[in-house]
């Protein structure tokens, strides 16, 4: 543990954290008025919480802020194109591009219909297969089983399972981004967990990237926390999902997403349960889904929701360390 703490206090690590944070803090006041001027505002669904309707027109695509911040940070640090940290950056960019296209089309059409489902699925499949192949040839097909102190070799099933894993993780983070600051706050904690594990297991570059992205998200939170001046949009949420999935894949810890990313999992399950129940019985289990909207309908404020979900994520990450 002492060596891990030393790594966290390493000048490169501290520089990555501070640069990511500083770049986001600087870019926020540049992007917010620019997106306002371009009329790149969020269209709010009328079937969502009524309290959210007043947020219509809030600048979206704010994911570009931490997207650019972490990219510049990694380039300044000077990693080679084939380094592990850069592979995570490529995944951030790849899935961020899908989100960017989705956001742009929503803005152009002035509704919440961006990329068609099949278009998004094709792009997700292309990038997921590429990253699954990278994992198959460079990382190995074994993954760590939580609490078991052992590994499971997926063999020929590795690539198809990893493709499903990417689709699930990116969409789960996307669903979590439904109230001001929620996805950002939860993901900062998850990234910190993976950074510590990265340093502890010798994946230094993955640790540095995780810290840089956590710093960039903290800077972004200055503008994304309630009341949000900007939303990350699909540009940000899909990028974060792709990056987290790749970080866990390199560390051979995809199964740990279920634990430390428990909030992502619950958000996704709430939607699946709600849709299944309504289609089969005509009744809803929750007042609204994803589940953060259910709690909003129960009277919880956005600040309370973010605080409680963040504390839960912190506890889940502690459990994640126990599961190693």
UniProtKB/Swiss-Prot annotation:
GO BP term, example? cell wall organization
Entry cofactors: Mg(2+)
Q: What is its main location?
A: membrane
* Keywords annotated in UniProt: Cell cycle, Cell division, Cell membrane, Cell shape, Cell wall biogenesis/degradation, Magnesium, Membrane, Metal-binding, Peptidoglycan synthesis, Transferase, Transmembrane, Transmembrane helix
The membrane topology of this protein is:
Multi-pass membrane protein
Q: Which reaction does it catalyse?
A: UDP-N-acetyl-alpha-D-muramoyl-L-alanyl-gamma-D-glutamyl-meso-2,6-diaminopimeloyl-D-alanyl-D-alanine + di-trans,octa-cis-undecaprenyl phosphate = di-trans,octa-cis-undecaprenyl diphospho-N-acetyl-alpha-D-muramoyl-L-alanyl-D-glutamyl-meso-2,6-diaminopimeloyl-D-alanyl-D-alanine + UMP
**What would be an example GO MF term here?**
phospho-N-acetylmuramoyl-pentapeptide-transferase activity
Query: Where does this protein act, in terms of pathway?
Result: Cell wall biogenesis; peptidoglycan biosynthesis
Q: Which GO terms describe its cellular component?
A: plasma membrane
EC number(s) from the headed UniProt entry? 2.7.8.13
Transmembrane segments in this chain: where? 13-33, 59-79, 85-105, 121-141, 143-163, 179-199, 201-221, 243-263, 303-323
Its function, per the record, reads: Catalyzes the initial step of the lipid cycle reactions in the biosynthesis of the cell wall peptidoglycan: transfers peptidoglycan precursor phospho-MurNAc-pentapeptide from UDP-MurNAc-pentapeptide onto the lipid carrier undecaprenyl phosphate, yielding undecaprenyl-pyrophosphoryl-MurNAc-pentapeptide, known as lipid I.
State the similarity comment: Belongs to the glycosyltransferase 4 family. MraY subfamily.
This protein's name: Phospho-N-acetylmuramoyl-pentapeptide-transferase
- Organism in which the protein naturally occurs: Clostridium botulinum (strain Alaska E43 / Type E3)
